[in-house]
Amino acid sequence: MTITQVKIKKLENFSGSLPEYATEHSAGMDLIAANEQPITIKAGEIQLIPTGIAIALPDSFEAQIRPRSGLAVKHGITVANSPGTIDADYRGEIKVILINLGKEDFVIEKGMRIAQMIIAKYERILWEESSSLTETMRGSGGFGSTGV
């Protein structure tokens, strides 16, 4: 496994610990809410939650912001644009767009674990326009064509 060093900046509203892996094989690191006052997300509502951190990703890396499964299954709280993408050239505060799909209001307190961040390497491509594509068994079948 390759370890890549990434610069992280604690902002004025930061509190708690830096994102870290919970176990040896965790893919994601928990992001912590850095809101000054509690934020209530009403049922069906979306809120932007600050984390108090900014990062400088190396070229060809992105950060993916994903839901925490416990918040989703227990409270209906998930990341609205999942996965959210943080590009390598973004230097502002990481914020998480949460939506409450549950039936009850939910309060985000400062220091609460609100999402996971996965750091991933990616490749860029160059389009090669073509009048035909190679045939596959699946062909153009989609949206349930391989079974439910």
UniProtKB/Swiss-Prot annotation:
It comes from the Bacteria. Its EC number is 3.6.1.23. GO terms for biological process: dUMP biosynthetic process; dUTP catabolic process. SUPFAM superfamilies: dUTPase-like. The gene is dut. Substrate binds at R68, S69, G70, N81, T85, I86, D87, K95. Pathway: Pyrimidine metabolism; dUMP biosynthesis; dUMP from dCTP (dUTP route): step 2/2. This is Deoxyuridine 5'-triphosphate nucleotidohydrolase. InterPro entries: dUTPase, dUTPase-like, dUTPase-like_sf, dUTPase_trimeric. Keywords: Hydrolase, Magnesium, Metal-binding, Nucleotide metabolism. It is an enzyme of class 3 (hydrolase). Its cofactor is Mg(2+). Belongs to the dUTPase family. The keyword Magnesium applies. One of its GO terms (molecular function) is dUTP diphosphatase activity. This enzyme is involved in nucleotide metabolism: it produces dUMP, the immediate precursor of thymidine nucleotides and it decreases the intracellular concentration of dUTP so that uracil cannot be incorporated into DNA. The keyword Metal-binding applies. It comes from Rickettsia felis (strain ATCC VR-1525 / URRWXCal2) (Rickettsia azadi). It catalyses: dUTP + H2O = dUMP + diphosphate + H(+).
